[in-house]
Amino acid sequence: RFRCPWQTVCTTRRWAKAPWWNVEYLIYEEEDAKKSIDCNNIKNDIDFLGADLLITLGVDLKSESEVKLCNELDIDLIVLENKKTVRERSYVYINPNQKGCQYRYKNLSLSALTFKLMQAIAIYYNLKSINKYLDLILIGAHWAKVPLKGENGVIIKEGKKFLINTNNYGLRAVMELNNIVELDDNSIVKIIELITPTGSTVGMVNNARIILELLITNDKDRAEQISKYLYNLKKPEE
């Protein structure tokens, strides 16, 4: 199982392609949905990339040992989750359901929560046009099946406007493959079904990487190639 909707990873990956940011990503490969990031993950998968900042989506650190290791390696931490917890963290921990958080909207999807972080960073760095990523945020929120009220409802409503006119080559290829010209809930479900990893754990990880490439590529032909591959992969055998 993947605890984080990879649409959220795609959004973060695409949005963070600023000239001064060198962004890498790691798809979480564990079947155990309760597993957290441990010291081995940090040493072998994260420090290996020379990371200065680790942003985790839906996966927390296992213990204070991991926090200490990140401090020793000069890796700053931002963890995004949305679940009830009373444990205090010594790092940036964004969770509307943590004890003491006064944020009004407690049922934000992880995608919506990521978008809130994007908004805050965009304001700080005076970055423009982050709303164009609402197409991906919409897909993640719809996949999570969150209540369509509050900020989730606003994001889904606005996201539909960006999705139908998306400039994302991957989403556009998927929509054209499914002959989607008008957007409704059934159309969104079709998109989600095509770009949701399936199969064994290994197969899911490999497909998730391919899907990630689909959603961040700037090559129209490559997007069409991947979308057709995914379509044939999921097409029932006759």
Where are these regions (language model features)?
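Short intrinsically disordered, low-complexity coil segments enriched in acidic
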Residues: R1-R3, N97-Q98
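Hydrophobic helix-and-loop "lid/oligomerization" segment in the mid-to-C-terminal part
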Residues: F2-L54, A122-E238
